Amino acid sequence: MPGIAYLGPEGTFTEAALRALDAQGLIPATQSGAGSVTPLATDSTPAALAAVRAGDADFACVPIENSIDGPVIPTLDSLADGVPLQIYAELTLDVSFTIAVRPGVTAADVRTVAAFPVAAAQVKRWLSENLPNVELVPSNSNAAAARDVADGRAEAAVSTALATERYGLDTLAAGIVDEPNARTRFVLVGCPGPPPKRTGSDRTSVVLRLDNVPGALVTAMNELAIRGIDLTGIESRPTRTELGTYRFYLDFVGHIDDDAVAGALRALHRRCADVRYLGSWPTGETGGAAPPPLDEATAWLQRLREGRP
């Protein structure tokens, strides 16, 4: 059974995403349904990806974007640095939180709240209205926050229902989130290999390093625009090697087997200082306008090559 590294300990949203990917048959070489993988808990998202690079796990399940704070920066940075990795699948979960406490603890007793920073940002308003003046204690994950409460390091935790149950805690409040329809997107990452087959509802992602010349980013974006490719996300991050130098993460609709996407990737490879391909994979839903099919001009050129003007 494939080993899948994830942000632990047991009870995180990432574990729930991993199990959902397994149940839906989205993990390569596992078509037998739930229970066909071995979850491997790690202390952080970078550690989960490092386990894949080291050969200690076949894949990693990591969060990459949420609807409140946008991209998950540790994931982006870890994908851009080190030995190349590739995304094979994605899954989006609706997210709400549980405020977990030890049995017998009331809201009046709470002075410290353990929380994963990403989770704390998503319940900031609720905490200010319902648990004002508490001290936030950073935790490595939502489940780790529950463990911190069980171990006595905080009176309450911003956690998950699963972790609350697993650590023998009580629920002070459930279904907590500042914004309705809060969602987090998770991706399955492995070593480079052939991408999943094109489905017609696909996403492709790349990381670009551009030469420091005027118009470099516009030129790169034009390679997508002129081919009718729908850019769904762009994020800049420092290279961390020299002040003022950046990498750009692009998400766009389509698959490497789409003619338009293939043409854009070839052009980006020519025009950019470096292109890291992060994969093409099924999204299971329409995330934007699909790339146009083989255009009339290309078909005309092909007829000329075949002697059929």
UniProtKB/Swiss-Prot annotation:
Site residues, Essential for activity: 184
Sorted UniProt keywords: Amino-acid biosynthesis, Aromatic amino acid biosynthesis, Lyase, Phenylalanine biosynthesis
All residue ranges annotated as the ACT domain in the record: 205-282
Pfam families: ACT, PDT
GO annotation, biological process: L-phenylalanine biosynthetic process
Subunit structure: Homodimer.
Protein name according to UniProt: Prephenate dehydratase
Naturally occurring in which organism (per UniProt): Mycolicibacterium gilvum (strain PYR-GCK) (Mycobacterium gilvum (strain PYR-GCK))
Lineage start: Bacteria, Bacillati, Actinomycetota, Actinomycetes, Mycobacteriales
